[in-house]
């Protein structure tokens, strides 16, 4: 059956019909992503929040991009420290956290977006 599907799709979608078609985009959240989203939403009421488990689903590395009014008046380091303190318990079980923060109303400077 896999060969039949491969042959059927090969003219349109596959460069090499001998290799299987692999879909890599996830359309679901991991439990860790949901937990981090819930915590940050409750504490910071962000206007924009994206949490991605970049460890392949094992929950050891996350990428977080957050935009919130709670960051007003804080420099980038203070913004990151705030997020780190909120996620203190979760961070203990992580290998790493890639964090990007932005002030919600800072239109002129384009926000305070950085990665660490």
From Swiss-Prot:
Q: A Pfam family matched by this chain, by name? A: BolA
Query: What are the record's GO terms for cellular component?
Result: mitochondrial matrix; mitochondrion
Q: Which InterPro entries match?
A: BolA (IPR002634), BolA-like_sf (IPR036065), Mt_Fe-S_assembly_factor (IPR052275)
Intracellular or extracellular location(s): Mitochondrion
Keywords in alphabetical order: Mitochondrion
Keyword Mitochondrion attached = yes
PANTHER family found in the cross-reference section: BOLA-LIKE PROTEIN 3
Please give the family membership noted in the entry. Belongs to the BolA/IbaG family.
Please identify the protein, giving its name as recorded: Uncharacterized bolA-like protein C4B3.11c
Organism in which the protein naturally occurs: Schizosaccharomyces pombe (strain 972 / ATCC 24843)
Q: What is the lineage of its organism?
A: Eukaryota, Fungi, Dikarya, Ascomycota, Taphrinomycotina
């Amino acid at each position: 059956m896999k060969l039949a599907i491969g042959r059927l799709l090969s003219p349109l979608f596959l460069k090499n019909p001998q290799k299987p078609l692999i879909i890599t985009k996830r359309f679901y959240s991991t439990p860790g992503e949901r937990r981090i989203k819930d915590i940050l939403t409750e504490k910071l009421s962000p206007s924009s929040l994206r949490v991605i488990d970049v460890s392949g689903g094992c929950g050891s590395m996350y990428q977080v991009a957050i935009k919130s009014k709670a960051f007003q008046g804080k420099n980038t380091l203070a913004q990151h420290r705030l997020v780190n303190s909120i996620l203190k318990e979760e961070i203990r079980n992580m290998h790493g956290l890639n964090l990007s923060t932005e002030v919600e109303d800072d239109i002129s400077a384009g926000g305070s977006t950085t990665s660490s």
